[in-house]
Each structure stands twice: as structure tokens, then as C-alpha cells.
UniProtKB/Swiss-Prot annotation:
<dbReference type="GO" id="GO:0009231">
    <property type="term" value="P:riboflavin biosynthetic process"/>
</dbReference>
<feature type="binding site">
    <location>
        <position position="170"/>
    </location>
    <ligand>
        <name>D-ribulose 5-phosphate</name>
    </ligand>
</feature>
<dbReference type="GO" id="GO:0030145">
    <property type="term" value="F:manganese ion binding"/>
</dbReference>
<dbReference type="Pfam" id="PF00926">
    <property type="entry name" value="DHBP_synthase"/>
</dbReference>
<feature type="binding site">
    <location>
        <position position="34"/>
    </location>
    <ligand>
        <name>Mg(2+) 2</name>
    </ligand>
</feature>
<keyword id="KW-0479">Metal-binding</keyword>
<comment type="function">
    <text>Catalyzes the conversion of D-ribulose 5-phosphate to formate and 3,4-dihydroxy-2-butanone 4-phosphate.</text>
</comment>
<feature type="binding site">
    <location>
        <begin position="33"/>
        <end position="34"/>
    </location>
    <ligand>
        <name>D-ribulose 5-phosphate</name>
    </ligand>
</feature>
<dbReference type="GO" id="GO:0000287">
    <property type="term" value="F:magnesium ion binding"/>
</dbReference>
<dbReference type="InterPro" id="IPR017945">
    <property type="entry name" value="DHBP_synth_RibB-like_a/b_dom"/>
</dbReference>
<feature type="binding site">
    <location>
        <position position="34"/>
    </location>
    <ligand>
        <name>Mg(2+) 1</name>
    </ligand>
</feature>
<protein>
    <recommendedName>
        <fullName>3,4-dihydroxy-2-butanone 4-phosphate synthase</fullName>
        <ecNumber>4.1.99.12</ecNumber>
    </recommendedName>
</protein>
<feature type="binding site">
    <location>
        <begin position="146"/>
        <end position="150"/>
    </location>
    <ligand>
        <name>D-ribulose 5-phosphate</name>
    </ligand>
</feature>
<comment type="similarity">
    <text>Belongs to the DHBP synthase family.</text>
</comment>
<dbReference type="InterPro" id="IPR000422">
    <property type="entry name" value="DHBP_synthase_RibB"/>
</dbReference>
<keyword id="KW-0460">Magnesium</keyword>
<feature type="binding site">
    <location>
        <position position="38"/>
    </location>
    <ligand>
        <name>D-ribulose 5-phosphate</name>
    </ligand>
</feature>
Length: 216
């Protein structure tokens, strides 16, 4: 899907292939925004190894990015009624799998919770609140509406032909500071991770829209 654009956008192509193969990607936002890198992965095929990497090398705040329709169907209320976060990140109430977990904190338990959320519907919920996974509401329109890691992760899942759901966690240095610049590049080389910027993803999507608008 969308392979006609891949040659022009090699980083997007590599990220899509990684998502399809169940491998993580490093997604960077704009320098004048958060200026941070998140490890992201498709929710439906995230591996135990990737989840352990997120818990070990990232902030520990494992987030499940979902499209607006899914958040509404699962009736996930906003974490607060008056969101005053600087970038308006769409946190909802936290979640946990209703069954099949122990403390909810381990890598396996968090994957179980994510799987339970993806299996849930308005009629049959397999999750409870509160919990140790933080759902995020991705705005309709993706990175063309909001240039956030939440939207970028869901956009990439869609482009990979997967469910519009992704997992992310902010990459950190061993000393507890945020990883940036060369620190991100070193980490990417160490683990052979594709690196993608939200700017590249936005340009890719804009090019798709332009091509779709061309007369047949």
C-alpha cells in the first residue's frame, strides 16, 4: 500500500516495513516542540522484547495510542476534564487487562493489557481502570492535524496496513535525562532501529494527498 511513494521517502518506507515486521521505530518530533524521540511499535504485533526495551530504556510511561473512534467505542474518558498540558496530549484514564495479569507492571502484563484493549468493544470490554497502560487519543487527521508522537504513531500503523493503534514510550539516557540529537543516533545504531521524523511523515502524507487529487 502506497508503495509508489516509498522511493522518495526511504525513512518512511523503512519505518513502515519495521511496523509490518513487528519491530520498533524511533520517531522524532520537531526541534521547537518537545524535541524528543519515542520508541514506537504497532500495537497488534508488539513483541515482549520491544516492550522490555521500552520499560528498560524509556520513561516507563507506556502509552497506547488509539484513533478517536476506538477511544469513543471503549468509552475511555479523558484523564482530566480540563486538559492544560502544554501540547494538549490526549491522555485518557489508565487501563489494565481485566484478567490474565499479576501486578500489571511487567512487560508481559502490559502486552496482555494492550491485547485486551484491542479485543475490547463497546459490547464486550476486557479492560478495567485504573492501570499501568496510558491510552492516548490521536486526533483525526493525524500529523496533518497535530504534529505529535501520538498521531505519528497511529498514522504509521495505518500506512503499514495495520490497526490504527500503536505503543510508544519516550527514550531516555541512562542518567535519566531525555535522549536527543547524537544520543538518539547512537541508540538507533546500537539496536539497528529505523529513525523517522514527524516532518518526514507529514510530507509523505501530503504527497499522498496530492497524488490522490491528480486526475486519473
Amino acid at each position: 500500500m502506497f508503495t509508489q511513494h516509498h522511493a522518495q521517502f526511504p525513512n518512511v518506507s523503512a519505518a513502515i516495513a519495521a511496523f509490518q515486521a513487528g519491530r520498533p521505530v524511533l520517531l522524532l518530533d520537531d526541534d521547537d516542540r518537545e524535541d524528543e524521540a519515542d520508541i514506537i511499535a504497532a500495537a497488534e504485533n508488539i513483541t515482549l522484547q520491544t516492550m522490555a526495551m521500552m520499560i528498560r530504556d524509556c520513561s516507563g510511561i507506556v502509552c497506547l495510542c488509539l484513533d478517536e473512534a476506538t477511544v469513543d467505542e471503549l468509552q475511555l474518558a479523558p484523564m482530566v476534564q480540563n486538559n492544560q498540558a502544554r501540547h494538549g496530549t490526549g491522555f485518557t484514564v489508565t487501563i489494565e487487562a481485566a484478567e490474565g495479569i499479576t501486578t500489571g507492571v511487567s512487560a508481559q502484563d502490559r502486552i496482555t493489557t494492550i491485547d485486551a484493549a484491542l479485543r475490547s468493544s463497546a459490547e464486550q470490554r476486557h479492560i478495567v481502570s485504573p492501570g499501568h497502560v496510558f491510552p492516548l487519543r490521536a486526533r483525526n487527521g493525524g500529523v496533518l492535524t497535530r504534529r505529535g508522537h501520538t498521531e505519528g504513531s497511529v498514522d504509521l500503523a495505518r500506512l503499514a496496513g495495520l490497526r490504527p493503534a500503536a505503543v510508544l514510550c519516550e527514550l531516555m539516557n541512562p542518567d535519566g535525562s531525555m535522549a536527543r540529537g547524537e544520543q538518539v543516533a547512537v541508540y538507533a545504531r546500537q539496536y539497528n532501529l529505523p529513525v523517522l521524523t514527524i516532518e518526514e511523515l507529514a510530507r509523505y502524507r501530503e504527497a499522498m494527498l496530492e497524488r490522490e487529487a491528480e486526475p486519473a
